[in-house]
Amino acid sequence: MLKKINLFFYLFYFLFFSSWSFAGERNDKNLLTFGAGLWDWNDSQTAGLFNFEYRHGTRYGPFKPMIGGLINTDHGFHIYAGIRMDLYLTDKIVITPSFAPGFYERGDGKELGHVVEFRSGLDLAYRRKNGARIGVEVHHLSNASLDENNPGTETYLFTYSIPLN
């Protein structure tokens, strides 16, 4: 039990305190991100996926706001707003966990059980000298049991982020 508590505190320190100094040393710009990948890739209702996202460069504590939307080839879409946290492994490699609640319309695709869906994810990106990023992202969408029907879905995307300022 003590080992689990110690592990929790080390993880907490790394995510919240060390990331502040890493992200604070960067002059991050606002980013416009485009992505393409697969929706529900680990299930029988796989569809193509396209994503568009605005990522604000200003930090509020360790977090940066984002807003975006995705549409799949089954005419379903998810519009969301949330937070991200850049964790720099090196000057060029960035890992970014994110969380965003949003509104979901299924189209002809998978029924996720509720109009409100929460997107949690992780992306890994290579940051170029001009601030642009090339990356890969994985996400899970779920209604967090707001409805009895809560199958969730997984997505993955290849992304390109363009610095805006």
Predicted regions: what is each one?
Residues 1-27, 165:
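Cleavable N-terminal export/targeting peptides
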Residues 30-32, 59-64, 91-95, 130-136:
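Repeated loop/turn-to-beta-strand initiation elements of outer-membrane beta-barrel proteins
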Residues 22-56, 163:
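Outer-membrane beta-barrel initiation region
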Residues 48, 125, 151-165:
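Outer-membrane beta-barrel "beta-signal"
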Residues 35-39, 55, 70-72, 84-86, ...:
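Outer-membrane beta-barrel pore domains and translocons
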Residues 38-48, 69-80, 107-115, 145-153:
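Solvent-exposed loop/turn segments connecting transmembrane beta-strands
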Residues 56-60, 73, 87-93, 127-130, ...:
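Outer-membrane beta-barrel strand-turn architecture
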Residues 51-55, 82-84, 123, 159-161:
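Outer-membrane beta-barrel architecture
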